[in-house]
């Protein structure tokens, strides 16, 4: 299994997240790696917390479901993760406009 130490890239990740926020964009939490033994969705909880603490609000959830059986795979994990990071909602897009759904 592959692991990485995101702390090695902390400064760069912070710059990227600030840029995303300044441009009114968001990030996605993706659960696909959980199918292959990763310990948590990507990005990890610490990066999601950093995004929140920097003022990030738009956050979507994906699973890379290339098969029906993986549609919304382990989204239960993400709900808890978002709450632990300080979020009260996640984001969906309707006609390219963000809508915030309470957790």
Regions found by a protein language model. Name each.
Residues 1:
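Active-site-proximal loop/short-helix segments
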Residues 4-103:
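Charged catalytic cores and adjacent phosphate/nucleic-acid-binding surfaces used
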């Amino acid at each position: 299994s592959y692991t990485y130490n995101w702390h090695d890239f902390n400064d760069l990740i912070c710059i990227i997240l600030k840029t995303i926020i300044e441009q009114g964009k968001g990030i996605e939490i993706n659960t696909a790696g959980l199918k292959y033994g990763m310990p948590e969705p990507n990005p990890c909880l610490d990066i999601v917390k950093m995004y929140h603490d920097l003022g990030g609000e738009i956050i979507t959830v994906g699973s890379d479901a290339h098969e029906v059986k993986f549609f919304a795979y382990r989204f239960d994990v993400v709900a808890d993760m978002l709450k632990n990071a300080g979020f009260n909602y996640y984001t969906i897009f309707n006609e390219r406009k963000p809508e915030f759904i309470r957790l």
